[in-house]
């Protein structure tokens, strides 16, 4: 009971975002059918000496609730807060939820919803919801591969980098988009795991001209079955951003994974 309350506290906390894509495919590759409640948490702590001492704590959570072996509720989030002297600052974040239906041993469909706010690069708020399907292409002792296809609604609110003196401060976007992705996880020896994902998103009428592409690479070293060290790289390339920003966005991160 204490563990469940702790996990709920993580999920309900304010959360941090890094980009337009959450790459949830990299975090939902496999489910242990012997566990009802399972997942990972990834805490990190940063300290800097500026005019005041600055502590920054980040934590991400990926929680799966298995229902009768054929349904999964998946919740993913991330939050961050900092202390600057005696002042505590809560940053933006995201939350992603999906309800996965296993229709066949290799095929599943799932409605999903996600929200992001106070993101980097000026994205003030984003909400998306839709329906996706996923088919398992490869399932061996060392390799797992999925192809995902879906359709979703996306609302975005961006702060303009240099608004006109009397012009609007924010730009808005309402779009229906398609989602296509390919994800693969490889076990390398006894301790290493490599997970990669490639994503294409676009509106039906601008499938190639104004697409958004994404790539993710996670490399994990499992110290024990429950504790690992993860390094991650994320790339987003938006061919037609709604405000004047760089088209490419890159993130490199590292942290500790604690599984249960």
Describe every region a protein language model picked out:
Residues 35-37, 53-57, 89-93, 123-129, ...:
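Residues that define the transmembrane beta-barrel architecture of outer-membrane proteins
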Residues 41-47, 75-81, 111-115, 131, ...:
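Transmembrane beta-barrel strands of outer-membrane/channel proteins
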Residues 37, 68-75, 106-109, 141-145, ...:
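Repeated loop/turn-to-beta-strand initiation elements of outer-membrane beta-barrel proteins
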Residues 1-35:
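Cleavable N-terminal export/targeting peptides
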Residues 222, 248-260:
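Outer-membrane beta-barrel "beta-signal"
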Residues 144-226:
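Outer-membrane beta-barrel transmembrane domain signature
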Residues 43, 59-61, 95-97, 131, ...:
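Membrane-embedded beta-strands of outer-membrane beta-barrel proteins
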Residues 45-47, 65, 101, 135-137, ...:
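Residue-level signature of outer-membrane beta-barrel architecture
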């Amino acid at each position: 009971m204490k563990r469940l309350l702790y996990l709920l506290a993580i999920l309900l906390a304010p959360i941090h975002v890094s980009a337009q894509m959450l790459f949830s495919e990299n975090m939902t590759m496999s489910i242990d059918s012997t566990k009802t409640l399972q997942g990972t948490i990834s805490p990190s702590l940063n300290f800097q000496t500026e005019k005041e001492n600055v502590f920054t704590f980040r934590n991400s959570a990926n929680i799966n609730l298995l229902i009768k072996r054929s349904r999964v509720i998946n919740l993913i989030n991330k939050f961050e807060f900092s202390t600057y002297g005696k002042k505590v600052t809560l940053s933006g974040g995201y939350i992603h939820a999906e309800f996965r239906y296993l229709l066949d041993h290799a095929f599943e469909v799932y409605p999903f919803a996600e929200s992001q706010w106070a993101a980097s690069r000026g994205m003030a708020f984003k909400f998306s919801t839709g329906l996706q399907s996923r088919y398992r292409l490869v399932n061996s002792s060392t390799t797992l591969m999925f192809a995902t296809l879906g359709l979703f609604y996306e609302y975005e609110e961006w702060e303009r980098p240099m608004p006109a003196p009397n012009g609007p401060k924010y730009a808005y976007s309402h779009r229906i988009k398609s989602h296509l992705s390919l994800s693969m996880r490889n076990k390398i020896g006894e301790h290493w795991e490599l997970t990669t994902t490639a994503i294409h998103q676009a509106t039906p009428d601008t499938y190639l001209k104004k697409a958004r592409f994404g790539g993710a690479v996670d490399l994990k070293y499992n110290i024990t079955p429950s504790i690992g060290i993860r390094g991650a790289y994320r790339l987003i390339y938006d061919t037609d951003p709604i405000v004047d920003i760089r088209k490419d966005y890159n993130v490199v991160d590292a942290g500790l994974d604690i599984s249960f």
